[in-house]
Amino acid sequence: MTDKTIDPPLNETFTWLQPGAWRNPCIVHVTMVASLRQALFGQLAHNGSEAIVEKTPIGWALINQERRMLELCPEIKILADKVMPDHHHMVLQVQRTMPRSIREVVRGYMQGCKSEARRLGFTAPLYDAPPFYRVLTHKGQLHAMIEYVKANAERAWQRRQNPELFRMHRKTGVCGLQFTSMGNHFLLDWPDRQLLEMSRSSGEAQIQERLKEVLVAAHNGAVTYTAAISKGEQKIARTVREHGFPLVVLLNGGFPAEGSPQERFYKPGGTYFEACSKGRLLLLEPAGQAFLDTSIQKAVAETLRRKAEARHCSYTDIPMESQRYRFVALNEMGRMLVER
């Protein structure tokens, strides 16, 4: 670990498929998952002040192998690591060009972990899939990833304490529309509701004025519904969340596909995670059929026609598969949910 600020490479055109790319200086987040997601590496617990992972002998072997890896590869620095019950993370910095690629180094590390596990009497496969690599190339990614790795145990503990809040529901029906959802569904039953919708052309003064109105209503008990599409909507929704007020967000995609490997382990990221764990968030992603609903189509057409007339333009229908249609439809669904 290090306290020194490190700037990740910013060349977004760099391709990690180029020969020798994985030997060059870079910063990589690596995730290695235990076979069948078994809790082979430890048990989640709480010491009264924070969530911790009580490591098994195999879990400690993973730590010991990290030290061995650093001895063999002095070009590498571990910026963050976390052993979880069924997986472990490392954020690795390659400080100078190596004779071997970082993939080869990680493969050797995993082989060392397997050997240690066998020495401890564990003869079954330790891993059943290759590690997941994420190269950090954008400014700000490094800090966010280190914080993510550090908070892994706390997030897992919160999910365990509130499992229903992190359970994905594929068929949540509201107002005759079907949604995929996650979070506090009781927010749908709260009678006092407000819609947060702002034009993309709204200036800072308009955003601040609307922010005041939304916060007053939220303080008085209103649940805020929003698609959080425009910058104004995003800013106000973020402030509502930071103040601890409940929020219902309509998503234009975001949940993993039904039946996909990611479905079982999906969880909202970043600040959404904390809001979800405290019962202050509900995420709603409309099913494809919801966008084709006749009442939604009619509402979208009326809204777009009204906006065109305000600009003294003629109105023409837009394709339902376009992002413009979907964005307006999300706001109309939000309006329908608020006004029901």
Where are these regions (language model features)?
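Glycine-biased, small-residue-rich flexible motifs in mid-sequence functional cores and linkers
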Residues: 168-340
